[in-house]
A protein has these predicted regions:
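Hydrophobic alpha-helical signal/anchor motif
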Residues: 1-3, 7-9
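Low-complexity, acidic/polar, glycine-enriched regions of mature
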Residues: 14-207
Length: 207
């Protein structure tokens, strides 16, 4: 997500560690019905990636979404038929700043979160609604509409339902397609990659 450098926020780069989420290869069946879950049973994070000649002086960030809820509707055959997710754009908090010349302070993290809220997302709701789910090669491709910062566009991601009852998926988001300008600093030598990842990892409620 882009940040206005004039705001005085030390947000040179955002990133998620490589391999932070490894999706399984087997798609399991689920109990028919509507499964609701949220922060109490999982995590929703935004992972961003730095680039540019000066990327070594920047930080990679992992941003937690603190308030969110999701639903998965499952048909009689045990296969999901719909996915919905809503998140509070004012609840994004920086969990960790990786790499960089010096660690992020608590103030740095708070300033970054404030800038994301006020200058980027504007407190507008974040929502995803599926329109089609396709099962193939032991995985589920979820297609639908994603709303960020007042703009709604098509989006898709791979979802994995694990044998332990967990659900995981990574949704790539190209910021500029939602009207968000990725951060650039040091005359363009340090940039936030346009495509970020929204990573879900949660446990579905048991019977």
């Amino acid at each position: 997500m882009g940040v206005d450098h004039s705001a005085g926020v030390d947000l040179e780069a955002l990133a998620c560690p490589a391999g932070a989420r490894e999706l399984g290869s087997q798609l399991m069946g689920l109990r028919p019905g509507t499964h609701e879950f949220g922060r109490d049973s999982g995590t929703l994070q935004v992972c961003t990636f730095r680039e540019g000649l000066a990327q070594k002086i920047g930080h990679d960030l992992i941003i937690d979404v603190e308030r969110w809820e999701a639903e998965v509707e499952v048909g009689h055959d045990g296969t999901p038929s719909a996915v919905r997710l809503e998140a509070d754009a004012r609840s994004l908090n920086v969990r960790e700043g990786l790499h960089g010349g010096k660690p992020l302070s608590d103030k740095d993290r708070a300033d970054i979160s404030k800038t994301i809220d006020e200058k980027i997302l504007g407190g507008q709701p974040i929502a995803f609604r599926s329109s089609a789910l396709e099962r193939h090669d032991g995985r589920l491709t979820v297609r639908g509409d994603l709303t960020i910062a007042g703009t709604t566009r098509p989006a898709s991601f791979e979802m994995d339902l694990r044998e332990d009852g967990g659900v995981s998926g990574t949704l790539p988001v190209t910021q500029s397609e939602w009207g968000i300008k990725p951060y650039r600093g040091f005359m363009g030598a340090l940039k936030v990659r346009d495509t970020v990842e929204v990573v879900l990892d949660a446990a579905l409620p048991s019977d």
